[in-house]
UniProtKB/Swiss-Prot annotation:
Participates in antiviral signaling. Acts as a negative regulator of MAVS-mediated antiviral responses, through the inhibition of the virus-induced RLH (RIG-like helicase)-MAVS interaction. Instead, promotes autophagy by interacting with TUFM and subsequently recruiting the autophagy-related proteins ATG5 and ATG12. Also regulates MAVS-dependent NLRP3 inflammasome activation to attenuate apoptosis. Has no inhibitory function on NF-kappa-B signaling pathway, but enhances NF-kappa-B and JUN N-terminal kinase dependent signaling through the production of reactive oxygen species. This is NLR family member X1. Disruption phenotype: Females infected with L.guyanensis containing dsRNA LRV1 virus, have an increase in footpad swelling and, in thickness and in immune cell infiltration in the dermis. They develop larger lesions. Ifnb and Il6, but not Tnfa, mRNA levels are also increased. Parasite burden is similar to infected wild type female. In contrast, males infected with L.guyanensis containing dsRNA LRV1 virus have similar lesions compared to infected wild type male. However, Ifnb mRNA levels in the lesions and parasite burden are reduced. It comes from Mus musculus (Mouse). It comes from the Eukaryota. The keyword Transcription regulation does not apply.
Amino acid sequence: MRWGCHLPRTSWGSGLGRTPQLPDEHISFLIQWSWPFKGVHPLRPPRAFIRYHGNSADSAPPPGRHGQLFRSISATEAIQRHRRNLTEWFSRLPREERQFGPTFALDTVHVDPVIRESTPDELLRPSTELATGHQQTQAGLPPLALSQLFDPDSCGRRVQTVVLYGTVGTGKSTLVRKMVLDWCYGRLPAFELLIPFSCEDLSSLGSTPASLCQLVTQRYTPLKEVLPLMTAAGSRLLFVLHGLERLNLDFRLAGTGLCSDPEEPGPPAAIIVNLLRKYMLPEASILVTTRPSTISRIPSKYVGRYGEICGFSDTNLQKLYFQLRLNQPDCGYGAGGASVSVTPAQRDNLIQMLSRNLEGHHQIAAACFLPSYCWLVCATLHFLHAPTPAGQTLTSIYTSFLRLNFSGETLDSTHTSNLSLMSYAARTMGKLAYEGVSSRKTYFSEEDVRGCLEAGIKTEEEFQLLQIFRRDALRFFLAPCVEPGHLGTFVFTVPAMQEYLAALYIVLGLRKTALQRVGKEVVEFVGRVGEDVSLVLGIVAKLLPLRILPLLFNLLKVVPRVFGRMVSKSREAVAQAMVLEMFREEDYYNDDVLDQMGASILGVEGPRRHPDEPSEDEVFELFPMFMGGLLSAHNRAVLAQLGCPIKNLDALENAQAIKKKLGKLGRQVLPPSELLDHLFFHYEFQNQRFSAEVLGSLRQLNLAGVRMTPLKCTVVASVLGSGRHPLDEVNLASCQLDPAGLHTLMPVLLRARKLGLQLNNLGPEACRDLRDLLLHDQCQITTLRLSNNPLTAAGVGLLMDGLAGNTSVTHLSLLHTDLGDEGLELLAAQLDRNKQLQELNVAYNGAGDTVALALAKAAREHPSLELLHLYFNELSSEGRQVLRDLGGSGEGGARVVASLTEGTAVSEYWSVILSEVQRNVHSWDPLRVQRHLKLLLRDLEDSRGATLNPWRKAQLLRVEGEVKTLLEQLGGSGH
């Protein structure tokens, strides 16, 4: 899978980060601890930051009167307050970044993207769109470090204005944010004063007159005292103009007059134009960031250097970014309050797997060329493996990702429509994505892409908007395919983005048939004229007794209802397609969708499929998940901010259509992985009432074999934890469940009648939660299977405390739980504390004759116990014989099963014993099992030799054959 990185915006847009420049094939960098420079604003304790050779922190200030301008005490204090204010403002992170842990901060974890110097001639070339819009840095001028942006050009001329441009997602906003913080900490000594402006903020002022001094003091009050010195600051004053595409600049003298006075009021756009003209503050340095489509708004004669932000064009930069991000310590608590902190070893393993996948899977490296998608990779891995904040869903991560990149972004600020860039992307890229999902393909030809982009374009104005989208945002969504066998095609930058956009295209109601479009126009026309026509027809009908008029009158009322039914049928068809995609039988034996997503990022260990082999059928199991997630209230609110509102009525009708289809198909028994996908859909939807109605018929929760990560435990608990009806059986066998997961699942386990927890990682610490579960007043468990867990004697003591106060459990399996003599002795001593138990299985626990006999006697005296399993313990022949005799006595009490025989006959429980062996043959110690089977085989042979009954001999021979077959499977001799 292919993904990327991005940082919060507040008013500073989207993007990621910083990498001063590097040679083509080598990245020389040093991760080090550093205080701010001595004497320069010690605002914070030491921070780890990335420094490449040639960083501005190492460059000497320019010659001249540097350091002499703001020497007065008042000016120095004003600058220091300005630095503190900027640090406070630019260090604030949105919620999406705080998820990475309490110590995460932009000034501690940052990697610069590659910046390549470009020339005006390159900017005049026609856009090459996707075919060459790849991450390869073009030959020619070398990459630039931040410290080199204002170095003299190749002709020795001083550079005063630098324009940095890049498509959505390349890291413009984060680069600016980090540059400001660098100045605040003294790592940009070439500039004594830095004044950042957000062009989005300036555009909100419209044409309201304001002078440059007013614009500065309104935003940075401490600078009032240094404004008189601004004109003398020269190149040591740096203006940062971020997001120039938000301003409509007119450099014609007829449109914007000349003005050199910083105190002269004028429209903000005019102030910026005169700054860029070098007519106002001609010596000041200016750094501009913008999108590619708006570079031409500044005449090239006013620009000293152009720099293209090329993202992470080297996988070493991507690896460094992932290492810094993923090594941040988390808070250690999941949504359920359980301690589920990720260990350093687990984080290292994630980073190593991701690094190997970057090296061997070129498509994910192509996606992570955009720093924004590196952010998405980290956010997704954090969601899959770290503690999950309450209410966070996969859909919300993708929606937040788009908000970080597209919030407030318009396609063209000069266009009267003020069309949202995300809205345009949903219509065009969503159409391509949905057509791909419908036809089950992920590779698109250039004709496919053009067909979706140019559909419905009729005017020159629409064509111009399309060209802007192509230059600024198309590379964000689509990337050239670099996989063998598919060169020359395009894919969505990450596969999941295709499914997200397809779902968005549907829930926004953008998919319409020709009949629906015509019907909508007819309804709108009827709505406009219907009332007037109805009034006229009513008057005419009273004057002239024409029978046709009432018919026409009623037809006008019918048209909206017919169209409403058409829309309803369309929603039902979409819901049907979504549910069928969720329950495709072809996907029944796939991994669950969360494991699929993790594997797409981290890769799958083992040999890769040969390029010439036929490809597997494409799977789009995330598409229905995203459809449900986009209908949740939180995601609809965020989408509305992006200019993609989903009406409440539309969301309700879509949800009703989905519920209707889920109610029909959701009752079928699903394989464990598909059942988890079904529950994940409800988790994404975040609607408890909806889930309770759809899942009200669920009686069996079979997740056996599903790897229950902390996230999956959270999903199951949040969806089913609030239900009221009991679950006949909850099967969590072989789920790699640990104590933290067990704690998270407690609300679900309380509803279970039969609970299977065998073959997990539950040790003595898990028995504390099991004890609390058994003592809970709502516990209704009757059968509890804990076999093949390392409970030990310490754990069984806690279990007995729970059983002492429990009134529901009748069947308890402690098969192969490492109890030993100590554990069985404890059971024998405390068994009488419980009065309801009917069956107890303590087979294969390494117990000897003495404690086994003591437990058997305690079981015989128990008021309700009917059956005790003791086979496969370390029993001697004499011990087994004593237990057989005890179980066969006619004094009543529990039956004791210690062998395959009862006297000279086959035990009626022989099939139970051999079934347990068959079921666990691959997880138990083969040598130990062989030894026990040979002892049982000897018992069978002895019993066969001691009986003359031919029927019994035949039964004994049959069981002997079964035992010999098992021995052969284990590699032992059946003789």
